[in-house]
Amino acid sequence: LLTLLADLSADKRNRVIIVSGRDRATLEKWLGHLPLDFIVEHGVWLRALGEEWTMLRPLTNDWMHEIRPILDLHVSRTAGSFVEEKEYSLVWHYRRADIELGEVRARELTSHLHFLASNSDLQVMEGNKVVEVKSAGVNKGAGAARWLSFYPADFIIAIGDDRTDEDTFGAMPSHAYTVKVGSTHRSLARFHLDTHHDVRRVLRALVEA
């Protein structure tokens, strides 16, 4: 995959943007050696190639001290789960927990957090074996739309495999090729690929086009 990204970004006609829920440090460690653009922490931070990180909009993390104990409580009640603290969001991961227990605890946590967020500028987001709390109005789609306002393109392809990628699909212009990977559940994407192997074949075809 790294080779494909390098080959795609080597063509000066292309701009390759990584849109991720991961934090800046992680993406820089994994992919910082490649000439890529980044939208990270679900749209909180944007960085075009050769430029500095900028925020989608001013945010505060003052709310974290109230929400963190709730997530920690679910960690104590769910073996294998853990909390990830980013700059402007908190994430409860349960990928390593018992499947059934993890799903039950996730529903409980989501319900509790939705109640707390109803009177605040926060939103609760469910992803792939994660529950995330962050500022309202910040998501992958908002970040992608902001990026496109700076760098419009004739050909756009957006590929994602997570629930949170639906925001990106929804933010794309009508001429964009939006592709959901994996789950065949209802999606805003126009196209579907079964596995990451199919994604690699598509990327290779783009390199060779």
Predicted regions and their residues:
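Active-site phosphate-binding/coordination module
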Residues: L1-K86
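Short amphipathic alpha-helical segments and helix-helix/interface helices
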Residues: L2-S9, T110-L113, A145, F169
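A structural signal for isolated positions on well-ordered beta-strands in alpha/beta enzyme cores
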Residues: R15-I17, D37, Q123, I157, ...
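Substrate-recognition "cap/lid" segment bordering the active-site pocket of phosphatases
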Residues: E41, R47-H65, M125-A153
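Short, conserved charged micro-motifs
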Residues: W63, I99-V104
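Short amphipathic alpha-helices in soluble, non-transmembrane regions
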Residues: I67-L71, V104-A117
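Charged, glycine-interspersed solvent-exposed loop segments at helix/strand-loop junctions
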Residues: S81-I99, D121-K134
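Mg2+-dependent phosphoryl-transfer enzymes with acidic/Ser/Thr/Gly-rich catalytic loops
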Residues: A136, G141-A209
